[in-house]
A protein has these predicted regions:
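CBM-like, beta-strand-rich accessory domains located in the C-terminal region of large
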Residues: 11-58, 133-134, 138-319
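Carbohydrate-active enzyme catalytic cores, enriched for enzymes
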Residues: 1-128, 182-185
């Protein structure tokens, strides 16, 4: 479900497992998917990892079945609410979009307030990331941050979460997301979705987001529509992988560099941009790459104030 690297991180993950047969610690989700393909005798994409796990190795001896990598294509997973936009013509670009439920059952214990967020990988390198989980009980303030809307690549209204956080594993007034349209082609495709989490405000706010991957022109367009009647503070958040270098070029343009990629982000002219580097004094600018393991990274806040319906476009281009 993504070209190169681990399976994208969404919601909680604590690196837990029941039995270790002595192999290296690899992505458990990728391992489980690979195992399911063996049992179901599906010859498909080997997900997430290049190395074969010990579990796969032994199962393959008995099942006489091997998994081979194949070219990814854009795909919809409507039951979960995840949608993959994949360019198959030139650059390997994977964009995973989230418009699924907040979480399981009415408490959504392991859910994060990340409706309409997305993660981006180009040529096997993570560019825009989900921050991960980091902690469950030891550091409640960090637990709250990593679950929050501001910690994800989506829009925050009036510094409030999309859903109402009632505890470390408890949510109330769940934001409901819905896919409005889904179109794909060999260059990527386009998805439009909305969520109703901010309709609970005294002046209800509806957030609709369209994301289009145009691989032929090496461009991603993100269009955020905010429907309201009174004044609101709008923050678009973007979080970059810790291996990326992020710099402001001018008042509305960012340059992101990784080992193999040079990427430009063009934000709305009317927005105020603030880059935050992770430190002991801020929650923003942190990425959890394992349970109880966090590293400093760069986060962007793109801030605007509106008092009527508004639309904002962000462009992501690479070379």
């Amino acid at each position: 479900i993504a070209e190169g690297g681990d399976i994208p991180q969404f919601c909680d993950g604590d690196d837990g497992y029941v039995l270790n047969l002595g192999g290296p610690k690899l992505n458990r989700k990728a391992e489980l998917i690979a195992m399911s393909q063996i049992f179901e005798d599906k010859k498909g994409e080997k997900p997430g990892q290049e190395e074969i796990t010990e579990v796969e190795f032994w199962l393959n001896q008995f099942c006489n079945h091997s998994l081979k990598s194949s070219m990814l294509e854009s795909a919809a997973f409507p039951d979960s609410g995840y949608y993959l936009l994949q360019n198959t013509n030139s650059y390997n670009v994977s964009l995973m979009f989230d418009c699924g439920p907040l979480g399981y059952t009415n408490i959504a214990a392991h859910g994060h307030a990340d409706a309409l967020s997305f993660v981006l990988r180009i040529e096997g390198e993570n560019i825009l990331i989900d921050p991960g989980t980091y902690d469950y009980f030891t550091y409640p303030e960090w637990r709250s941050y990593f679950k929050s809307t501001q910690a994800h690549n989506t829009v925050e209204i009036d510094e409030l979460d999309q859903s109402v956080m009632k505890g470390l594993f408890l949510w109330d007034q769940h934001a409901e997301s819905s896919c409005d349209s889904w179109e794909v082609d060999s260059n990527g495709g386009k998805i439009t979705a909305h969520h109703d989490g901010y309709l609970r405000l005294s002046d209800p706010v509806l957030h609709t987001r369209t994301v289009e991957l145009d691989g032929a022109n090496s461009t991603i367009s993100v269009i955020d529509n905010i429907d309201c009647k009174k004044e609101h503070r709008v923050k678009m958040h973007y979080h970059y992988d810790h291996q990326c270098q992020v710099n402001l070029v001018d008042s509305h343009t960012l340059e992101i560099r990784s080992k193999r990629n040079a990427i430009t982000m063009i934000l709305p002219d009317e927005a105020k941009l603030t880059l935050t580097e992770g430190s002991d004094k801020t929650f923003l600018g942190h990425q959890s790459i394992g349970y109880h393991h966090k590293v400093a990274t760069t986060s962007l806040i793109c801030e605007l104030v509106i008092n009527q319906p508004a639309s904002f476009t962000t462009k992501i281009q690479w070379r």
